[in-house]
Protein backbone atom coordinates (compact mmCIF):
# COMPACT_ATOMS: atom_id res chain seq x y z
CA UNK A 1 0.00 0.00 0.00
CA UNK A 2 2.81 2.42 0.90
CA UNK A 3 4.46 1.74 -2.47
CA UNK A 4 1.27 2.98 -4.18
CA UNK A 5 0.55 -0.46 -5.62
CA UNK A 6 -3.12 -1.27 -5.86
CA UNK A 7 -4.00 -3.91 -3.28
CA UNK A 8 -7.03 -6.14 -2.76
CA UNK A 9 -7.21 -8.05 0.52
CA UNK A 10 -9.21 -11.28 0.79
CA UNK A 11 -9.72 -12.48 4.34
CA UNK A 12 -10.70 -15.73 5.96
CA UNK A 13 -12.14 -16.06 9.44
CA UNK A 14 -9.83 -15.90 12.44
CA UNK A 15 -8.40 -19.18 13.65
CA UNK A 16 -11.03 -21.44 15.21
CA UNK A 17 -14.01 -19.23 14.40
CA UNK A 18 -15.41 -21.34 11.55
CA UNK A 19 -15.05 -24.53 13.60
CA UNK A 20 -16.85 -22.82 16.50
CA UNK A 21 -19.70 -21.73 14.22
CA UNK A 22 -20.01 -25.25 12.77
CA UNK A 23 -20.16 -26.61 16.32
CA UNK A 24 -22.96 -24.19 17.18
CA UNK A 25 -25.05 -25.38 14.21
CA UNK A 26 -24.60 -29.01 15.29
CA UNK A 27 -25.80 -28.16 18.81
CA UNK A 28 -29.00 -26.71 17.36
CA UNK A 29 -29.78 -29.49 14.90
CA UNK A 30 -28.17 -32.40 13.08
CA UNK A 31 -30.36 -31.48 10.10
CA UNK A 32 -29.59 -27.78 9.77
CA UNK A 33 -30.85 -26.04 6.61
CA UNK A 34 -27.92 -25.86 4.16
CA UNK A 35 -28.76 -22.24 3.27
CA UNK A 36 -28.83 -21.13 6.91
CA UNK A 37 -25.72 -23.21 7.65
CA UNK A 38 -23.77 -21.33 4.96
CA UNK A 39 -25.05 -17.99 6.27
CA UNK A 40 -23.80 -18.82 9.76
CA UNK A 41 -20.42 -20.36 8.93
CA UNK A 42 -19.55 -17.53 6.52
CA UNK A 43 -19.98 -14.86 9.20
CA UNK A 44 -16.44 -15.29 10.54
CA UNK A 45 -15.04 -13.78 7.34
CA UNK A 46 -17.30 -10.76 7.73
CA UNK A 47 -15.92 -10.10 11.21
CA UNK A 48 -12.31 -10.45 10.04
CA UNK A 49 -12.83 -8.07 7.11
CA UNK A 50 -14.43 -5.42 9.31
CA UNK A 51 -11.59 -5.69 11.84
CA UNK A 52 -8.91 -5.42 9.14
CA UNK A 53 -10.65 -2.45 7.53
CA UNK A 54 -11.11 -0.75 10.89
CA UNK A 55 -7.42 -1.15 11.66
CA UNK A 56 -6.32 0.15 8.25
CA UNK A 57 -8.56 3.20 8.58
CA UNK A 58 -7.16 3.77 12.08
CA UNK A 59 -3.62 4.00 10.66
CA UNK A 60 -4.70 6.33 7.86
CA UNK A 61 -5.28 3.90 4.99
CA UNK A 62 -8.68 4.29 3.35
CA UNK A 63 -10.43 0.92 3.29
CA UNK A 64 -13.76 -0.79 3.73
CA UNK A 65 -15.03 -4.32 4.07
CA UNK A 66 -16.87 -5.89 1.14
CA UNK A 67 -19.17 -8.84 1.67
CA UNK A 68 -19.44 -11.24 -1.25
CA UNK A 69 -22.93 -10.02 -2.21
CA UNK A 70 -21.70 -6.42 -2.29
CA UNK A 71 -18.98 -7.10 -4.87
CA UNK A 72 -20.81 -9.35 -6.07
CA UNK A 73 -19.10 -12.74 -6.29
CA UNK A 74 -21.38 -15.27 -7.98
CA UNK A 75 -21.33 -18.98 -7.20
CA UNK A 76 -22.90 -22.13 -8.54
CA UNK A 77 -23.36 -25.54 -6.99
CA UNK A 78 -24.49 -26.95 -3.69
CA UNK A 79 -24.35 -25.16 -0.39
CA UNK A 80 -21.10 -25.94 1.49
CA UNK A 81 -19.41 -26.81 -1.82
CA UNK A 82 -20.17 -24.03 -4.26
CA UNK A 83 -17.67 -22.65 -6.75
CA UNK A 84 -17.08 -19.15 -8.03
CA UNK A 85 -18.44 -18.60 -11.53
CA UNK A 86 -18.17 -14.84 -11.94
CA UNK A 87 -16.99 -11.71 -10.17
CA UNK A 88 -18.33 -8.29 -11.13
CA UNK A 89 -15.37 -5.96 -10.92
CA UNK A 90 -16.79 -2.47 -11.43
CA UNK A 91 -17.54 -1.57 -7.79
CA UNK A 92 -14.13 -2.76 -6.61
CA UNK A 93 -12.30 -1.04 -9.48
CA UNK A 94 -14.11 2.24 -8.73
CA UNK A 95 -13.26 1.92 -5.05
CA UNK A 96 -9.58 1.28 -5.81
CA UNK A 97 -9.55 4.28 -8.19
CA UNK A 98 -10.87 6.42 -5.32
CA UNK A 99 -7.76 5.44 -3.32
CA UNK A 100 -9.34 2.71 -1.22
CA UNK A 101 -8.15 -0.75 -0.27
CA UNK A 102 -11.01 -3.26 -0.55
CA UNK A 103 -11.12 -5.98 2.10
CA UNK A 104 -13.21 -8.79 0.58
CA UNK A 105 -14.69 -11.79 2.37
CA UNK A 106 -13.23 -15.07 1.19
CA UNK A 107 -14.91 -18.49 1.33
CA UNK A 108 -18.28 -17.24 0.08
CA UNK A 109 -20.39 -15.93 -2.75
CA UNK A 110 -24.03 -15.61 -3.75
CA UNK A 111 -26.05 -18.03 -5.84
CA UNK A 112 -28.79 -17.42 -8.41
CA UNK A 113 -31.33 -17.10 -5.57
CA UNK A 114 -29.18 -14.34 -4.02
CA UNK A 115 -28.38 -16.57 -1.03
CA UNK A 116 -24.95 -16.80 0.55
CA UNK A 117 -23.09 -19.97 -0.32
CA UNK A 118 -19.76 -21.22 0.94
CA UNK A 119 -16.91 -22.85 -0.87
CA UNK A 120 -15.27 -25.92 0.60
CA UNK A 121 -12.81 -25.61 3.50
CA UNK A 122 -9.82 -23.60 2.33
CA UNK A 123 -12.24 -21.54 0.29
CA UNK A 124 -10.70 -18.21 1.27
CA UNK A 125 -7.48 -19.21 -0.49
CA UNK A 126 -9.53 -20.26 -3.53
CA UNK A 127 -11.39 -16.93 -3.37
CA UNK A 128 -8.10 -15.02 -3.31
CA UNK A 129 -6.85 -16.93 -6.34
CA UNK A 130 -10.07 -16.36 -8.29
CA UNK A 131 -10.14 -12.66 -7.39
CA UNK A 132 -6.51 -12.36 -8.51
CA UNK A 133 -7.44 -14.05 -11.79
CA UNK A 134 -10.49 -11.87 -12.45
CA UNK A 135 -8.62 -8.66 -11.64
CA UNK A 136 -5.55 -9.80 -13.61
CA UNK A 137 -3.40 -9.23 -10.53
CA UNK A 138 0.36 -9.17 -10.88
CA UNK A 139 0.61 -11.39 -7.78
CA UNK A 140 -1.53 -13.37 -5.39
CA UNK A 141 0.17 -13.61 -2.01
CA UNK A 142 -1.47 -15.94 0.50
CA UNK A 143 -0.68 -15.71 4.21
CA UNK A 144 -1.87 -18.82 6.01
CA UNK A 145 -1.48 -20.81 9.21
CA UNK A 146 0.11 -23.78 7.40
CA UNK A 147 3.26 -23.96 5.32
CA UNK A 148 2.52 -24.87 1.72
CA UNK A 149 -0.47 -26.28 -0.13
CA UNK A 150 -2.13 -29.47 1.12
CA UNK A 151 -4.67 -31.92 -0.27
CA UNK A 152 -7.00 -30.90 2.57
CA UNK A 153 -6.80 -28.90 5.81
CA UNK A 154 -3.89 -30.44 7.79
CA UNK A 155 -5.26 -28.91 10.99
CA UNK A 156 -8.35 -31.10 10.63
CA UNK A 157 -7.11 -34.16 8.71
CA UNK A 158 -3.84 -35.65 9.93
CA UNK A 159 -3.34 -37.62 6.68
CA UNK A 160 -3.33 -34.44 4.56
CA UNK A 161 -0.46 -34.50 2.09
CA UNK A 162 1.68 -31.51 1.18
CA UNK A 163 1.72 -30.80 -2.56
CA UNK A 164 5.25 -30.08 -3.75
CA UNK A 165 4.30 -28.39 -7.02
CA UNK A 166 0.96 -27.13 -8.30
CA UNK A 167 -0.06 -25.07 -11.31
CA UNK A 168 -2.24 -21.97 -11.21
CA UNK A 169 -4.97 -23.88 -13.05
CA UNK A 170 -4.88 -26.75 -10.54
CA UNK A 171 -5.22 -24.27 -7.68
CA UNK A 172 -8.43 -23.00 -9.27
CA UNK A 173 -10.04 -26.47 -9.30
Give short role names for the model-derived ranges.
Residues 1-173:
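Nucleotide/pyrophosphate-binding catalytic subdomain
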Amino acid sequence: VKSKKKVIVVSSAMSGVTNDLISKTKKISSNFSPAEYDTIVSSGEQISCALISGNLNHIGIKSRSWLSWQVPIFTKGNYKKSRITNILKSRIINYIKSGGVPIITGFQGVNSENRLTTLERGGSDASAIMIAKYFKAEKCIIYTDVEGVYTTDPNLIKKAKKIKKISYEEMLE
